Amino acid sequence: CHNASYVTRYDVTEGIKEGGTFLLNSEWTLEEMEHELPAKMKNAIAKNHLKFYNIDAVKLAKEVGMGNRINTIMQSAFFKLANVIPADQAIEYMKAAAKKSYAKKGEDVVARNYAAIDAGANAIVEINYPESWATTTEGAVVKPVTDDPYFTQFISPILAQNGDKLPVSIMSPDGSVPTGTTKYEKRGIAVEVPVWNAEACAQCNQCAMVCPHACIRPFLIKDGTEVPFETKAATGKEFAGYKFRMQLSPLDCTGCGNCVDVCPAKTKALKMVPLHTVQETEGANWD
């Protein structure tokens, strides 16, 4: 599982054999996993006596200069654990492929890929989980974003990759579906999300324009309106009497960083920070 948010979104251990190997990419310790992993997942891990491993590929990618690209690290970790071919041989093949693919981009790029390959193979940590996981009923619980029957009965199972299990009877006889349901998805897949620095913002709105998921948007608030977040005076005569706010929907953001890249300010008006540090605050602001 390459994204920690998937543990509460999908049944990531479904179909795994007894004694199988499960690799998770997360920043969590065993103690943190007690409340970050859902009870059903912990049950499956313990009951099937899985060999459970963790790797913090996001941290490793930053350390070796790969930015937010974790694919090479995860692939190396896979070969280390899977033994489809000898791990040393797999690493040699991966390095040969990296050199062939990136040699024209310079030795530095090749070296960073080599470092990522080595890091993936050497930074795997085995998780010695307790036997109590087999029967525990405690763990992460996903809060429903809406009680809309169409979402809970139809869309939610599809988002969890269980659409094939839905009966035909649950569908509308005339084939109609409500619109605007993507607002309920709230995937929360970003590792880092942008936060707004009002002082540095020129109100150009380029960040909102470039966002591929429309999850960062400008808002105008009438002067005198009580709001729990930071604002600044809106620029332009036509906006006199209004305050300006650039607001993120943290759980809709994918963490691509396009908004930060496009910001023309010398001191960027947006800064990427870990999702978990702002999820609650920024989520409430968006709502």
Give the predicted meaning of each segment.
Residues C1-P157, T225-E230, E282-D287:
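Active-site cofactor/cluster-binding pocket
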Residues A90, A103-D252, V260-D287:
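Ferredoxin-type iron-sulfur electron-transfer modules and their immediate structural context
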